[in-house]
Amino acid sequence: MPASPSPSRFAGLDGLRAIAVGLVLIYHLFPGAGVHSGLVGVDVFFVVSGFLITSLMLRPSTHSLGYRMLDFWRRRARRLLPALAVALTVCASVAWAIGGDVLVGIGRQLLGASTFSYNWVALAGGSDYFAATEPELFRNVWSLAVEEQFYLLWPLLLPLLLVVLRARWLLVAFAIVAAGASAWWMSVLVGEGAVTRAYFGTDSHAFGLLLGIALAFALRDMPDRAWMHSSAARVGGFAIGMLGIGLIVVAALQPGHPAGSGFPGTLLLASVGSLLSILAGVLPGSWFGRAVDVQPLRWIGDRSYGIYLWHWPLLVLVLAATGQGVSAGAAGVPVLSGWVTLVLAVVIAAVSFRMLETPVRRLGLRRSLRAIGARFKRNPLTRFATLSALVAALLALGGTTAAVAMAPPMTTAEATILAGQKALKNRTAKPAPHPEPTPTAIDGNQITAVGDSVMLASAPALYERFPGAFVDAKVSRSSWKGPGIIDALAASGALRQHVVVALGTNGSIDRRVLQKMADEVGPNRDLVLVNAYAPRDWIPGVNAELQAFASVRSGVVVADWSGAIAPHEDLLAGDRIHPGAAGGRIFAEVVEKGIRDSEAERAARPHRTPEPMGY
């Protein structure tokens, strides 16, 4: 007798799904709530899927292998495709009605979502999961693509493994080693800076699925021992389950890692917590499984697929319709927008579960249509509802077609960045040794500017205001790149009198990096640190660190881009980060004020040397 109950219904899995989708919802809809790594909910889903699907496939059957494979794929299609088709067409149609940035790349997204290859299609298209320059209406289906690729390949590989590795411990060892290899590959990719590739890749993000597989192998045909039903075993199992939930929560509360520095550690922590929770739930006589499967959590868990499927597109649409940008930061989602999205996602998922997913899953598509046809003949209300649904379906298909046809080639943020790149490419100014300082005038030939995509978007305005300035700006550049760039310019004699640095948009700033840049600039030049403005949760810390450093270091001032642009968000692109032409002029004004402040500070200390760090 197996230790676990019938694979058709494992205790605790619905509750675990509810916890997983809850973490993802908080992470996306309420990013200021402190669940900075709520994306680990996806890894909980992966572990549950790996365990559940493998357990189902290991169940004894009298049917042939080919029949079982086809039956498995048919049931997966019934479960996933109807809701996905409705979500894609409805959301694409609404996006067409809204227009603008939300339509960018929608054809590619629909292709990836409908073929369950979204993760690879997105990578081929240069998508950056951790950037905010492109909304990507269906970005969340990348994880569904990973799972579907698993559903396609695993039924083909499992029979071969069962023949080659017959012993249970060999199967468990194989799955654990494969999971370790996947996690190692993610760490390698993250180390190379390919964070989105590491996160999206089926090969590099398969460790959760593989750990779930390992647990399914371990519990296969496990004998039911008397001690498993003892009070001590039940209490111990409950403690193990709570430890698992605790590990998941701890992982979700880890600080955000914009550069992926927490990968794969944080994701592995949540995966191990999921393993412990599943194990505690499926043990005979377990209290934990029943405790986690309380009715509210079970209700959410049953509908977790639909809630997850709908929540992100709805969030993008709500923010687009209300003129807000889409970002992963704490300021990126107004609380009201988060609640509106949550209510819509839960209501739509509940209706979809009852009216669409459950009938198709139980009866199949053809039998469901026959049942509707039979009621259509007898019931006027059914006739009205059916005709309304047909009209809505036609409108959704038409709207989806229009969305693809009318999608703009790039977002407003990408357009501003492209303009900056063209300005850099066409500039005539060349880096040259800085001239002797002039008393008060700001000459572009005295300026070296190093920055990220915000400075890049402002490059045309900088060249207009400071002809001859040298600007070195690049998309996704972090503060860690600053010292190397400044050091190279100084070594070549090309570092000018006024050094302007704007590198706070893409992650936190370490005071050691600021110290190194200031040392390289030296006591005879001015260092202007431009603070940051973006709907990202690390921005307040960045700006505070810049201000604190400038307050104790001579020759360093802060240019307040945040304060200058905050009242003029309408001058930013749709992502609420990158300035357009008018916003770029404000950026240039901020830089000019910063340089004048640095000149005034230098004039007040004609013979002073740099002060030591005071903290």
Please give the residue ranges for each predicted region.
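Hydrophobic membrane-embedded alpha-helices
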Residues: 2-3, 9-13, 19-402
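Structural motif
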Residues: 497-500, 526
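Extracellular/periplasmic envelope-modification machinery, especially enzymes
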Residues: 254-257, 322-336, 343-347, 354, ...
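Short amphipathic alpha-helical segments and helix-helix/interface helices
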Residues: 13, 237, 459, 514-519, ...
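Active-site segments of SGNH/GDSL-like serine hydrolases
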Residues: 517-544
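Active-site flanking residues adjacent to catalytic metal/cofactor-binding acidic residues
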Residues: 42, 451, 501, 559
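Short hydrophobic segments within beta-strands
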Residues: 47, 450-451, 502, 530
